[in-house]
């Protein structure tokens, strides 16, 4: 897999396992030549965002004491059948496990902070590798079993956590939208009367893929005080309430899918593109000039790379396009006067001079970024169809990806939505692309089950195979 290179050939993707039957894209961080750089740029965007909200990054170990997982299993929810145990040559050593989530581990850390006299609220993030053994079937998130990147945030506080919930759910949707990844924020429905063993409420950011299925990008769990009570996270005798946020490589992989709507020419948003400007010499003799231009762009903070493959112009253009660069700078040969063309593909665009390359590239990248975001949001909205009632099997061919159906909060109506088996229940939509819906402004429509007027709705669609 790590030797595979995207060449615009969908069959090659299948053979290299970058695309698989289990999930649209897998193994992106090991995909040559730039998968790791793409993942890192996405992580940096979320790191900066959480830092702006007062979150501090911790370097948590990937190994956690097995005792912490056992305490969680005894009073909250057990993951003991899904963890990897790490063995030591010393039989007397404390048994440890590979971390699968942050909650038990960070609860112990926060309890220690409180004993040392630190005061809440606590807001932290961490990025690391996690692992999980899914013995009952491979879940899309865990195709590699050991997952990197895994980004988590945890907030612990006394009192109302609605502002932190909105920050984790809706504001992060704005981060995703700004890199060309459209989202809908939803709250997961659960069977009326069912107690949440792990969390009081679960929120998600989902995206509707171009092929017509939905996939979950981020999750926000309202954990209540269950972890604080189990691990002794108390301030002045009061257990702290907790929120957990997380996303994995799945978010990056969904970003790849949206970027590859044209498999011959993927395009990444300038903010996260490993190569913002691909510099392509039309003839091999222009490689030196191309290198000087790329260096000038780099000096102005624009990520540029020269594609000077000696096998010929076609090889150069194919490799340049494979990097998903949003902008191309073509260095024409002597027969065309050595002109420079700046455009959205090789050999296209307006003629510019060497002295204006950096300024014009910066202007074009800003415009292209706005255009990509707008197109992604518009296309995403077209995948949602509004309906008055639950769909019938005969309606499926007319549903682009999902349907939004009015649904009130009555227990019988929630059960009716969960019981229908035509489409998967994605959740109750609460916002999109970083903006929360104004519940009071939503027009009342007859509930699909009881017909009472309601401003609430439910999103139904086809979840990607294996997703719960």
Model-based region annotation:
Residues 316-335:
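A short, hydrophobic beta-strand-centered structural micro-motif
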């Amino acid at each position: 897999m790590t030797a595979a290179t995207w060449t615009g050939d969908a069959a090659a993707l299948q053979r290299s396992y970058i695309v698989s039957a289990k999930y649209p894209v897998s193994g992106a961080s090991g995909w040559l030549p730039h998968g790791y750089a793409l993942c890192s740029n996405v992580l940096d965007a979320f790191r900066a965002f959480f830092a702006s909200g007062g979150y501090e990054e911790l370097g948590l170990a990937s190994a956690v004491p097995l005792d912490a997982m056992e305490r969680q299993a005894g009073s909250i929810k057990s993951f003991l059948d899904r963890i990897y145990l790490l063995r030591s040559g010393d039989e007397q050593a404390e048994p440890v496990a590979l971390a699968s989530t942050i909650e038990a581990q960070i609860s112990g850390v926060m309890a220690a902070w409180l004993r040392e006299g630190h005061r809440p609220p606590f807001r932290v993030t961490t990025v690391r590798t996690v692992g999980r053994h899914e013995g009952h079937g491979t879940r899309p998130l865990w195709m590699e079993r050991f997952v990197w990147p895994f980004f988590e945030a945890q907030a612990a506080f006394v009192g109302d956590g609605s502002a932190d919930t909105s920050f984790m759910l809706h504001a992060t949707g704005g981060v995703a939208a700004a890199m060309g990844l459209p989202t809908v924020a939803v709250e997961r429905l659960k069977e009326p009367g069912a107690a949440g063993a792990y969390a009081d409420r679960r929120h998600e950011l989902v995206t509707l893929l171009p092929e017509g299925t939905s996939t979950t990008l981020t999750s926000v769990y309202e954990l209540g005080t269950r972890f604080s009570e189990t691990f002794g996270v108390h301030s002045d005798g009061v257990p702290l309430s907790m929120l957990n946020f997380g996303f994995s490589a799945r978010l990056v992989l969904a970003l790849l899918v949206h970027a590859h709507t044209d498999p011959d020419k993927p395009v990444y948003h300038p903010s996260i593109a490993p190569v913002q400007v691909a510099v392509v010499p039309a003839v091999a003799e222009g490689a030196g000039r191309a290198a000087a231009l790329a260096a000038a762009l780099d000096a102005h903070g624009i990520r540029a790379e020269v594609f000077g493959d000696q096998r010929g112009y076609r090889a150069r253009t194919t490799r340049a396009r494979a990097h998903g660069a949003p902008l191309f700078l073509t260095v024409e040969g002597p027969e065309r006067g050595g002109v420079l063309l700046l455009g959205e593909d090789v050999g296209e665009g307006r003629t510019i001079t060497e002295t204006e390359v950096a300024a014009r590239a910066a202007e074009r990248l800003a415009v292209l970024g706005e255009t990509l975001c707008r197109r992604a949001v518009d296309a995403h909205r077209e995948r949602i169809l509004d309906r008055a009632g639950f769909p019938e099997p005969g309606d499926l061919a007319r549903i682009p990806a999902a349907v939004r159906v009015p649904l009130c909060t009555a227990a019988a109506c929630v059960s009716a939505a969960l019981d229908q088996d035509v489409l998967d229940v994605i959740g109750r939509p609460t916002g999109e692309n970083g903006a929360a819906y104004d519940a009071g402004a939503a027009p009342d429509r007859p509930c699909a089950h009881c017909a009472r007027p309601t401003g609430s709705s439910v999103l139904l669609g086809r979840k990607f195979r294996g997703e719960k």
